[in-house]
């Protein structure tokens, strides 16, 4: 793959060149931070990947809005861990003004809620921005298109509880796992 990089640490001329190469299809992939041009209007972006947790839904929505501007199918992928949340919370806790700190925490909580959705993501985003999706199923987000498998885990839970009780709760999880596995 032909890829370029774009971040605030690059010299201005290198950033400009990376952006031009991407716009002119000389580079297929651009790996960028949020420093990447807000005004990028490339209609055929097919994939936007967030490798870390965004700070706000506003920022996330603006960034994913770069995908599929030509109306063709595109994908957005968001990877996150709870470590991302803790990192953002560390910086939020550095904010001295309580009102600003509370607002930043609320925005972070909204992003986390979005990440943990099991219902339509598009509906959630549109509602957040004061719009409405008439259907509960957009037929395009992962929550709406996922084939969900369920199973009754009550037997497994009973065996785990039985193993804990039979060992008088004196052992750690690794020992209990060994007992269960035989």
Tell me what each language-model feature is.
Residues 1-36, 40-182:
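C-terminal helicase lobe
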């Amino acid at each position: 793959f032909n890829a370029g990089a774009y971040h605030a640490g690059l010299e201005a001329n290198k950033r400009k060149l990376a952006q031009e190469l991407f716009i002119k299809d000389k580079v297929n992939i651009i790996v960028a931070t949020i420093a990447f041009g807000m005004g990028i209007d490339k209609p055929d972006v097919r994939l936007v990947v967030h490798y870390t947790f965004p700070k706000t839904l506003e920022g996330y929505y603006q960034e994913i809005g770069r995908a599929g501007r030509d109306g063709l199918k595109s994908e957005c992928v968001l990877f996150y861990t709870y470590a991302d949340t803790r990192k953002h919370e560390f910086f939020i806790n550095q904010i001295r003004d309580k009102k600003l700190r509370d607002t930043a925490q609320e925005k972070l909580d909204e992003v986390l809620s979005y990440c943990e959705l099991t219902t339509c993501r598009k509906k959630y985003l549109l509602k957040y921005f004061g719009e409405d999706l008439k259907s509960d199923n957009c037929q395009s987000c992962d929550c709406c298109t996922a084939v969900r498998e369920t199973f009754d885990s009550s037997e497994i839970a009973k065996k785990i509880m039985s193993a804990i009780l039979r060992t008088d709760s004196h052992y750690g999880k690794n020992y209990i796992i060994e007992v269960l596995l035989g």
